[in-house]
Amino acid sequence: MQNRRDFLKTAAFAAIGSGLTIRQALAAETVPTTFSINRLGKGGKMKMTFFPYELKLKHVFTVASYSRSTTPDVQVEIEYEGVTGYGEASMPPYLGQTVDTVMAFLKKVNLEQFDDPFQLDDILTYVDSISPGDTAAKAAVDIALHDLVGKLLGAPWYKIWGLTKEKAPSTTFTIGIDTPEVMREKTLEVAGQFNILKVKLGRENDKEMIQTIRSVSNLPIAIDANQGWKDKHHALDMIHWLKEQGIVMIEQPMPKEQLDDTAWVTQQSPLPIFADESLQRLCDVAALRGAFNGINIKLMKCTGMREAWKMLTLARALDMRVMIGCMTETSCACSAAAQLSPAVDFADLDGNLLISNDRFRGMEVVKGKITLSDLPGIGVTKI
């Protein structure tokens, strides 16, 4: 026979799985009036606070279109009945979002109108309706709310989703564009810690970069061309050459506007082709089938964990492969993304490893593999 606490948790899990609110899930049962269930949606208000936080990179980060040594970020906390959920918005340049736009958006969010934090769909539908964009700001609220709800349930989200943490894959570690000497140093520094590398290409010296890495490591490599190859014939020639160098997948080989050219490349490619810049939200997934073999889901682009889970589910239904990625982020957002990792083919969750001022301890990389804890919510603690 269940005790009261176990009953409430069971009701909460049932509510999330069925789309009911906690109040609806509890409606058919008689709960003693002397038993407090404030933490499961019978009173109290959610309070959200947020503040800017600049992420400092350990090394200058260079891709095909820019270089940077910091990344703007906004930290979010949602408190309910003494329990706090954490989230964040990370804003690399290409997102087109800034600290000012994120702060302005968050000031419009009124969570106090909701009594039940388990009303995830209602709350996040409301948050999404505030503006057509602001995906990173929306993701910050989504992550914090998922962390809060998971903590109230006493379970990590991978368990709530029915996943097994042992199935989490290895994560890639990104080697940014740099001089040959620096790239060799970076590769040697991490080669013994990771099982697969990721290399940013899309410049004239692409082959030289791969040869530089191959001079010191034979690890499998995932390639992110960052839309850098403009001609489809050049892109296909590069992919054939890269396959001979032990590359295992290609991400966004061509500009997102060149979908037909990308489809031509994908249909003839000996390696799987994944969408990154061509993909943002759930509504984009179906249109990419045929043009790409898979998709790279990033919380900062898709508004968070709720939509990421839907995108993953749809991609699987369309027989597409899935990668879970990240921006330069603290362990907060990386750990949130990692909750989905047992269900994906590839993971690129090294954003927290690229910064020197992480605020959290969360997902770990052990012998190159994503290792999830049993901590509830998104599995993080503040440092």
Summary of predicted features, one role per range:
Residues 157-269:
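Metal-dependent enolase-superfamily TIM-barrel catalytic cores that perform enediolate-based chemistry
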Residues 76, 82, 141, 154, ...:
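Conserved, mostly hydrophobic/aromatic
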Residues 54-62:
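Short Pro/Gly-enriched beta-strand edge/turn motifs at strand-loop
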Residues 257-262, 268, 274, 278-349:
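Catalytic alpha/beta core domains of metabolic enzymes, predominantly
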Residues 39-50, 66, 79, 84-152:
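Metal- or metallocofactor-binding catalytic centers and their adjacent structured scaffolds
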Residues 1-3:
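N-terminal secretory signal peptides
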Residues 35-55, 73, 81, 327-383:
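Flexible C-terminal active-site loop/helix
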Residues 6-28:
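N-terminal export signals
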